[in-house]
């Protein structure tokens, strides 16, 4: 029911060749800064990001939901492709968002066991969740460009994109915003520096500055899950009575409920739930709206986080800037003739 797929190794020589060809092509442009990141993404394939070795967990849709989430925890992964044995193909992804949706949909009280989580199979949950709406799996070929991958991630508002070999039907890797930005950062020092890198978030209007979803220390966990479901955000800054950020509760933190087997009591506060973090937490990573895009990119990549909380001098929350915001700005907004795709 749970299996690991071997991933193919990428050829480092081919990556170097692609990059040299990309740099060579820049010398023939009247303005070497023009569309630099867009052209970089168009000159590299998804295959170039497939590591020599990585863990890929695949679930059969006949697996029990509870076992699947426990398997995510034990394997240290955030999502898994779903294989339908009847159709003999991949049909979707199981993510932490599914776990949140199940908990929020079926939770009643600490005294009532969540039967649907305990007994439902993945295929049963998909039938309930999707109902009559058909949502095909969004995937990409290893030979497709990284530009196509970024476009697909942003267009479909997804965080994980399976790279599937069209010949074998095997899933080779799961592409994410983080992995793509990290790959770009490897080469960014060798590329021309566009002027917009020296502009601030405020000047470029990058990030979300209005209707920021936040929670307080005493917010019930069930209410926080409701915000995740209704507003489709991936993290909630935890603020004090003055609006100052004191912590952050992300979708990834919710999986700790499975790890600790504490998902039957969602009446506890967000603060109480955060005490169950499985990893060391160094604090909320923040930035200011007057910091440059270059500084923001460096901080995101070096800290390996998905977002920064934008604060003012008093640490009051003013916005959020995410990896998807950055890729949108680098590759699409400032990449295609200054137009947003």
Where are these regions (language model features)?
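Tandem CBS (Cystathionine beta-synthase) repeat/Bateman regulatory domains
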Residues: 1-341
